[in-house]
């Protein structure tokens, strides 16, 4: 099993900054979302 962790990232001044973890919006929405121009990116994946 591989488990992945996602975090929100934004690019400012050509540098990407990492923010809070991504949260699914609502129970039905499986897509993880970030607000205010932040993008959800895979932080790391671990093999369990």
UniProtKB/Swiss-Prot annotation:
| Main location, first listed in the record | secreted
Keyword set includes Disulfide bond: yes
Q: Does the keyword Transferase belong to this entry?
A: no
Q: Which GO terms describe its cellular component?
A: extracellular region
Q: Which residues carry this modification: Methionine sulfoxide?
A: 44
The intrachain disulfides are 4-34, 8-40, 22-45
Give the UniProt keywords, A-Z. Disulfide bond, Neurotoxin, Oxidation, Secreted, Toxin
Write down the superkingdom of origin: Eukaryota
Subcellular location, in the record's words? Secreted
Q: What does the sequence similarity comment in the record state about its family?
A: Belongs to the neurotoxin 12 (Hwtx-2) family. 01 (Ap1a) subfamily.
List the protein's name: U1-theraphotoxin-Agm1a
Q: Which organism is it from?
A: Acanthoscurria gomesiana (Tarantula spider)
